[in-house]
Amino acid sequence: MDFASLATEYQEKFDVAPQRVFFSPGRINLIGEYTDFNGGHVFPAAISMGTYAAYSARDDKQFRVYSANVPDAGVLTFSLDNLAFDKADNWANYLKGMLFELAKQDLTIDHGFDLFVHGNLPDASGLSSSASMEMLMGEILHAAYGMKLDEVEMVKVGQQVENDYFGLNTGIMDQFAIGMGKKDQAILLDTNTMDYEYAPLALGDYVVVIMNTKKRRELTDSKYNERRAQCEEALRRLQTKLDIKTLGDLNEDEFDENAYLINDDVLIKRARHAVFENQRTLKAFDALQKNDLQRFGHLVNASHISLNYDFAVTGKELDTLVETAWQQPGVLGARMTGAGFGGCAIAIVKKDNVADFEAQVGKTYEDTIGHPAEFYVAEIADGPAEL
């Protein structure tokens, strides 16, 4: 998708040419799953698939918004005077939520606009289409109203929309990965301190292949909130003896020595994943820095095993993709990415093997699950921008 095609779509819907066009990427997480609300590290990257928008300012307080991805919703309208969540406003609640949270900061928001949105992220795939939308709206609002918020501040507003406006217990990784994305760079983020460091994603003869189960996952309908509550309860029990604020404060040995305090087999497994995954993420960052791709791949594999055995968030579809990927030539590693329960996995695949990889994994998946998977080679991209 480019400026011209999006502008044409906008003109067909609103009968005038747009004033500006914007883009916001999606994201993958290389490693560090379910660590962001446990005070641990994550290692995500923005990708070239994402969400586009064409925009024109209005001289009143009205908003008219349309998404080519949700055509049945039609043109949705709302006013600056009523930014409360309304289920009838469908996807427009992402824009309303960003406006609602930014309005709390005494920023001048004095007019509405017309907006045409078209994304190429697969729906409900776990590639963060919601965070992509939030950061897209942040970029548009930044431009529309001359806001002085920096990228990290806008990222935090996006998380507030998820937590306060939608009532979801999500961490900050998705918004951060997108809002702070850099081309060909992954981001090691300490979610406890918000310290971050970029790492060149120099994979040489290898590429990241995204594998889509085509099984929809709904964050609010999944066991995401249950897993978070389990980790919080395990932490509370550890804190009866240990002076820690998060599970991410522990290393593997410290956890093993004190796991008896949790006194519940399921909670021990959940907490063990959080602690060990955090350490794997740090080791993976170190491996990439040293160009040790074999070690990086082994850590990626270990992450999926933990997400399956200790955290129980994978499921038959993701396990079929990942376990089949492990058996293919030219594969360094593979794991689920995102919240799980469907959605996507990633594999680090030698470029020369990609076509055969997709064919073999695709055949096994369709034979096993009964419907085809989709595959995309990930390009690591910059964060939100005006085109």
UniProtKB/Swiss-Prot annotation:
Annotated Gene Ontology cellular components are: cytosol
Location of the active site: 174
The record describes the protein's role as:
Catalyzes the transfer of the gamma-phosphate of ATP to D-galactose to form alpha-D-galactose-1-phosphate (Gal-1-P).
Which Gene Ontology terms describe the biological processes this protein takes part in?
Answer: galactose metabolic process
Per UniProt, what is one Pfam family of this protein? GHMP_kinases_C
Q: Tell me the route in metabolism or biology where this protein functions.
A: Carbohydrate metabolism; galactose metabolism
Q: Where in the cell is it found?
A: Cytoplasm
User: Which EC class is this protein assigned?
Assistant: transferase
Question: Which residues does ATP bind?
Answer: 67, 124-130
Q: Write one Gene Ontology MF term.
A: galactokinase activity
Which reaction does this chain catalyze? alpha-D-galactose + ATP = alpha-D-galactose 1-phosphate + ADP + H(+)
What EC number(s) is this enzyme filed under? 2.7.1.6
Know the name of this protein?
Galactokinase
By its UniProt entry, which PROSITE patterns does this protein fall under? GHMP_KINASES_ATP (PS00627)
Q: Which UniProt keywords apply?
A: ATP-binding, Carbohydrate metabolism, Cytoplasm, Galactose metabolism, Kinase, Magnesium, Metal-binding, Nucleotide-binding, Transferase
Specify where it is mainly localized.
cytoplasm
User: Which species does the entry assign this protein to?
Assistant: Levilactobacillus brevis (strain ATCC 367 / BCRC 12310 / CIP 105137 / JCM 1170 / LMG 11437 / NCIMB 947 / NCTC 947) (Lactobacillus brevis)
Q: Where does Mg(2+) bind?
A: 130, 162
So which domain of life are we looking at?
Bacteria
Per the UniProt record, the site (Transition state stabilizer) maps to: 27
Lineage at the top is:
Bacteria, Bacillati, Bacillota, Bacilli, Lactobacillales
Q: Which family does it belong to?
A: Belongs to the GHMP kinase family. GalK subfamily.
UniProt keyword Calcium, yes or no: no
List residues binding substrate: 33-36, 224
